């Protein structure tokens, strides 16, 4: 007797096999597409790394740092075994979509240009006020370098040996007779200070000063690399020249430095004459702050400086040469020799093409996500 399978059961078995082989084929196809997209995006990033600045004017050191962190991830996940094709394809598509959209939506940034033609003889000063929040007092003076290239800052701060605060701590001790004594212990810590965007209001609160002076959209992460100061926020002075450190503090803390990326010329985004400086606690809260005011101007009386406008991009003559800064006393003595050399204007910082490519990649990669699910 020949056994015959009912047509209904045969249909179910055929459908099951069809679904099994169909899903396997679909997984294989999605895996191949995802791997191809990995390769495409890898070569796109490779092109960003090695293209000349004339082709990609917005590809600067800061963007290279961000893109470089993505390459190891791409290289590792692009060679998964075939057995993991289904889950890998989904993760790959999601990662590619997010990374491409993140690249597209990122705020356009550029390295800060050196400031030139800063007016000579003008001095801006920020004087830290008397406040119950901290005993830190002092002044920060700023004037253009004698070459007109950048700004020389001179810090004279004191009050770090107050009873309580970020640099000292009050310890209660007991001697052999059980007599209580108080001892001030010096803490090993560092404190940041920055130029902030807005001035301090009349009530003296440091909160409304907003964020650091950052006209080029760099942001606070990753942290400033002092070996590449042009990639830092122009207002991040402690990031570029070092924090206030207790190990070097006695009665006064004095420091003089030449910053090439801030300006005393009104109208530029890097102008700080109507902004503020903020000193932070070691836990990043704002300890004290003060406004910069014009205290010296050659040949004229002190006048109000209007709020700056513009992008801070400089197109002018860039002097070359060396300068020497002396830190004797509270007023810096600066000498410099330089020869102005005309150079071409920097290229226009237009990120439209890069953002268009990013959005296109993001759309393509996002379309792969439903295939992987």
From Swiss-Prot:
Q: What does this protein do?
A: Superoxide dismutases serve to convert damaging superoxide radicals, a key form of ROS, to less damaging hydrogen peroxide that can be converted into water by catalase action. Degrades host-derived reactive oxygen species to escape innate immune surveillance. Involved in the occurrence of miconazole-tolerant persisters in biofilms. Persisters are cells that survive high doses of an antimicrobial agent.
Q: Which residues form the signal peptide?
A: 1-55
What is its EC class?
A: oxidoreductase
Q: How is the cofactor bound?
A: Binds 1 copper ion per subunit.
GPI-anchor amidated glycine lipid modification positions: 352
In Swiss-Prot or TrEMBL terms, this protein is called Cell surface Cu-only superoxide dismutase ARB_03674
Which InterPro entries has this protein been placed in?
A: Cu-only_SOD, SOD-like_Cu/Zn_dom_sf
Q: How does it assemble?
A: Monomer.
Q: What is its EC number?
A: 1.15.1.1
- Primary location recorded for the protein, binned into one broad class: secreted
Q: Which reaction does it catalyse?
A: 2 superoxide + 2 H(+) = H2O2 + O2
């Amino acid at each position: 007797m020949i056994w015959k399978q009912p047509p209904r059961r045969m249909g179910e078995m055929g459908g099951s096999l069809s679904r099994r082989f169909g899903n396997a084929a679909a997984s294989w196809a999605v895996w191949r597409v995802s791997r191809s997209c990995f390769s495409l995006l890898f070569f796109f990033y490779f092109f960003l790394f090695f293209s000349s600045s004339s082709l990609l004017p917005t590809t600067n050191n800061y963007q290279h740092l961000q893109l470089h962190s993505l390459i190891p991830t791409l290289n590792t996940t692009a060679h998964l075994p075939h057995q993991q094709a289904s889950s890998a394809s989904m993760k790959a598509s999601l990662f590619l979509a997010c990374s491409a959209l993140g690249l597209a939506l990122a705020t356009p940034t550029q390295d800060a240009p050196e400031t030139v033609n800063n007016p000579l003889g003008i001095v801006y000063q920020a004087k830290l006020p008397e406040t119950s929040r901290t005993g830190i007092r002092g002044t920060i003076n700023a004037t253009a370098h004698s070459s007109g290239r950048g700004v020389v800052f001179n810090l004279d701060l004191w009050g770090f040996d107050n009873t309580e605060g970020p640099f000292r701590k009050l310890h209660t001790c007991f001697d052999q007779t059980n007599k209580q004594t108080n001892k001030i212990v010096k803490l090993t810590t560092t404190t940041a200070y920055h130029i902030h965007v807005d001035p301090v209001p009349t009530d003296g609160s440091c909160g409304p000063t907003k964020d650091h002076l950052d006209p080029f959209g760099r942001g606070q992460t990753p942290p400033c690399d002092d070996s590449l100061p042009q990639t830092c926020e122009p207002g991040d002075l402690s990031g570029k020249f070092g924090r206030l450190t207790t190990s070097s503090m006695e009665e006064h803390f004095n420091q003089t430095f030449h910053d090439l990326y801030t300006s005393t010329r009104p109208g530029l985004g890097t102008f700080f004459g109507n902004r503020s400086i903020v000193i932070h606690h070691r836990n990043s809260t704002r300890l004290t702050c003060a406004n910069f005011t014009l205290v010296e101007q050659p040949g004229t009386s002190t006048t109000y400086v209007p709020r700056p406008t513009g992008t801070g991009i400089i197109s002018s003559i860039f002097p070359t040469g060396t300068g020497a800064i002396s830190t004797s006393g509270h007023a810096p003595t600066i000498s410099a020799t330089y020869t102005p050399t005309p150079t071409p204007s920097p290229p226009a910082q237009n990120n439209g093409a890069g953002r268009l490519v990013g959005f296109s990649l993001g759309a393509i990669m996002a379309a792969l996500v439903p295939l992987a699910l």
